Amino acid sequence: MARISGVDLPRDKRVEIGLTYLYGIGLSRSQEILAETGVNPDTRVRDLSDEDVAKLRAYIENNYQIEGDLRRWEAMNIKRLADIGTYRGRRHRQGLPVRGQRTRTNGRTRRGRRVTVAGKKKAPAKK
């Protein structure tokens, strides 16, 4: 079983896809890593030798920030924006879109589900 940065790569997938299970590594970066280390992208994770896994692990740890380190770095950047009082930091704190999107309609991904507010009940009709 291939384990890199505390993440078990899925055994039945190709190495090229398996590496994308690491936070911070997408398909392009995965292909780049495999080209640099000389590992065949079509190999299944279960068929990797210990030497290949060690080579991949060493290359990734030396050249990229992934998993916990990357998450911590992102959180620190967001916290820095909030601490210095920027508009972007305020939007992060409020849980609203940060990059200028409209919020009168849409923006539901960032804001979450609608919370319905009970309206006034209609007064009974007079006869």
UniProtKB/Swiss-Prot annotation:
Ranges for region Disordered: 93-127
Keywords: Ribonucleoprotein, Ribosomal protein, RNA-binding, rRNA-binding, tRNA-binding
Pfam families from the UniProt entry: Ribosomal_S13
Biased composition (Basic residues): 101-127
Signal peptide limits: none
BP term (GO), one: translation
Residues forming coiled coils: none
Family classification: Belongs to the universal ribosomal protein uS13 family.
The protein's assembly and partners: Part of the 30S ribosomal subunit. Forms a loose heterodimer with protein S19. Forms two bridges to the 50S subunit in the 70S ribosome.
Protein name in UniProt: Small ribosomal subunit protein uS13
Lineage: Bacteria, Bacillati, Cyanobacteriota, Cyanophyceae, Oscillatoriophycideae
Protein's gene: rpsM
